[in-house]
From Swiss-Prot:
The gene is cbbL. One of its GO terms (cellular component) is carboxysome. SUPFAM superfamilies: RuBisCo, C-terminal domain, RuBisCO, large subunit, small (N-terminal) domain. PANTHER family: RIBULOSE BISPHOSPHATE CARBOXYLASE, RIBULOSE BISPHOSPHATE CARBOXYLASE LARGE CHAIN. Mg(2+) binds at residues 193, 195-196. The lineage of its organism: Bacteria, Bacillati, Cyanobacteriota, Cyanophyceae, Synechococcales. It holds the Pfam family RuBisCO_large_N. Substrate binds at residues 115, 165, 169, 287, 319, 371. This is Ribulose bisphosphate carboxylase large chain. Gene3D superfamilies: Ribulose bisphosphate carboxylase, large subunit, C-terminal domain, RuBisCO large subunit, N-terminal domain.
Length: 471
């Protein structure tokens, strides 16, 4: 062994920088944005990322002789400049598929981002995109139902779904919470929702909330003749409690439940998605905590990666921001990861932040959910941006109506149907937005009041996390 094994430390780039390598269709590809410490060559930084996220360690080890390192190692095969940032660069790394457990997003993320982000040789590191090979996608369960099945279950076609988050998000008793749900649904909404942090607090235990909400949903259905639903948040402190809540929602004949997939974790989310698939339940996904991970433009994980991972882990709806509301997100970036939620094939398109072609095969799509600081004036833009396969959720834009939640719901329903009708007639709904809404308001006093109430409410802040494109 001593004749074959050279102990010591060698540069990462000697093994993991392979510019001649041509990625295989079965490779998992990742794009990292890297900013190294001063004086460290780019190739060494990129190779260090490839090594630490695959087979490498800081020292040469004798046990490498017991396996085929050339087969299993990650390979940095390309480096690119980042437009507008002379310190940063993109490192493209190919990983052989055998490095990952089949169907395990938890394992993929543990490998790619689990340890390497703490490297001293790096000042910043960000995972910008992943190309999942179709061979891996076929091992994932994906959405429990998908867009087509969800529309059939809810009997909603030809327009976005319309919903709202119950406000105030915390502090209501179960009975009063149910009353607010009823007011929204009878006013014209399709769905209402628990907020991300309503679980089972002293002021409102989860079982109490579920029972009053179920009563409200069924009463609204009887009055309106429409299928209604409420996203019952089953997120809990243990997996056992998570499933107990899901089972009770099923007993109440509720069509949809909810999970906070980042705080709850991918293992819990995949398990819940599998349960929903077996039990005929729709699954709404909230992205609480995402901005801690994805908002810094140089460090963390881009939301397009988190969105792709969610589609593989499982969910029928996912919050994506609004572009026009109170939350971070520019239009092109948002369209990029909406494509990856809904389409069967998404081509590389740097103008939308997509670094790779992504083939989703036959995996069902996910509804994009627009929620956060939106109101009736935003309706034309939301329809233009998100299209029909989306869910538009107006929380304050429903409950803040001067006449109450039912009137706010009615205003949103009239605005949505007016915009859909105008779009279907060939009108340019964003350019003609004011005319379309004002025409509809002539026949809806609820909409007229809503337009007056929110006519000056805008969220015009510069985007922190911008696309890296040549200007």
């Amino acid at each position: 062994m001593s004749k074959k094994y050279d102990a010591g430390v060698k540069e990462y780039r000697d093994t993991y920088w392979t510019p001649e390598y041509v990625p295989l269709d079965t490779d998992l590809l990742a794009c990292f944005k890297c900013t190294g410490q001063e004086g460290v060559p780019r190739e060494e930084v990129a190779a260090a990322v490839a090594a630490e996220s695959s087979t490498g360690t800081w020292s040469t080890v004798w046990s490498e002789l017991l396996t085929d390192l050339e087969f299993y190692k990650g390979r940095c095969y390309r480096i690119e400049d980042v437009p507008g940032d002379p310190e940063a660069f993109y490192a493209f790394i190919a990983y052989p598929l055998d490095l990952f457990e089949e169907g395990s997003i938890t394992n993929v993320l543990t490998s790619l981002v689990g340890n390497v982000f703490g490297f001293k040789a790096l000042r910043h590191l960000r995972l910008e995109d992943i190309r999942f090979p179709i061979a891996f996608i076929k091992t994932c369960g994906g959405p429990p139902n998908g867009i087509v099945v969800e529309r059939d279950r809810l009997n909603k076609y030809g327009r976005p779904l319309l919903g709202c988050t119950i406000k105030p998000k915390l502090g209501l008793s179960g009975k009063n919470y149910g009353r607010v749900v009823y007011e929204c649904l009878r006013g014209g909404l399709d769905l209402t929702k628990d907020d991300e942090n309503i679980n089972s607090q002293p002021f409102q235990r989860w079982r109490e909330r579920f029972e009053f909400v179920a009563e409200a949903v069924k009463l609204a259905q009887q009055e309106t003749g429409e299928v209604k639903g409420h996203y019952l948040n089953c997120t809990a402190n243990t997996p056992e409690e998570l499933y107990e809540r899901a089972e009770f929602a099923k007993e109440l004949d509720m069509p949809i439940i909810m999970h906070d997939y980042i705080t709850g974790g991918f293992t819990a989310n995949t398990g819940l998605a599998n349960w929903c698939r077996k039990n005929g339940m729709l699954l709404h996904i909230h992205r609480a905590m995402h901005a801690v991970i994805d908002r810094h433009p140089k460090h963390g994980i881009h939301f397009r990666v988190l969105a792709k991972c969610l589609r593989l882990s499982g969910g029928d709806q996912l919050h994506t921001g609004t572009v026009v509301g109170k939350l971070e997100g520019d239009r092109q970036t948002t369209l990029g990861y909406i494509d990856n939620l809904r389409e069967s094939f998404v081509p590389e398109d740097r103008s939308r932040g997509n670094f790779f072609d992504q083939d989703w095969g036959s995996m069902p799509g996910v509804f994009a959910v627009a929620s956060g600081g939106i109101h009736v004036w935003h309706m034309p833009a939301l329809l233009a941006i998100f299209g029909d396969d989306s869910c538009l959720q107006f929380g304050g834009g429903t409950h803040g109506h001067p006449w109450g939640s039912a009137a706010g719901a009615a205003a949103n329903r009239v605005a949505l149907e007016a915009c859909v009708k105008a779009r279907n007639a060939g009108r340019e709904i964003e350019k003609e937005s004011r005319d379309i809404l004002m025409e509809a308001a002539k026949h809806s006093p609820e909409l007229a009041i809503a337009l007056e109430t929110w006519k000056e409410i805008k969220f015009e802040f510069d985007t922190v996390d911008k696309l890296d494109v040549q200007g």
